[in-house]
UniProtKB/Swiss-Prot annotation:
<feature type="region of interest" description="Disordered">
    <location>
        <begin position="22"/>
        <end position="48"/>
    </location>
</feature>
<protein>
    <recommendedName>
        <fullName>Uncharacterized 8.0 kDa protein in EGT-IAP1 intergenic region</fullName>
    </recommendedName>
</protein>
<feature type="compositionally biased region" description="Pro residues">
    <location>
        <begin position="37"/>
        <end position="48"/>
    </location>
</feature>
Length: 69
């Protein structure tokens, strides 16, 4: 059977060697992105009663330009 040193050799051969030069190059290519501050959620409008909602939708429809073909 294989002894411990033989096992280590197989493991080191299988795992890709980590090259510090490659690491340095990749660090240069991708600059550290600034961490965005999370935007607070938009305040929800107060709930309208049904007639108000209908009125608002009607107003929006009236504001939309009507195109005649």
């Amino acid at each position: 059977m294989c002894d411990a040193s033989c096992d280590e050799e197989i493991i080191s051969r299988r795992t890709p060697t980590f090259s510090p030069k490659l690491f340095r190059k990749s660090r240069e290519l991708s600059p550290i992105k600034p961490v965005r501050t999370p935007t607070p959620p938009a305040p929800t409008p107060p709930p309208m009663c049904f007639s108000e909602e209908l009125q608002r939708k009607f107003q929006e429809k009236k504001l939309l330009p009507v195109y005649d073909d």
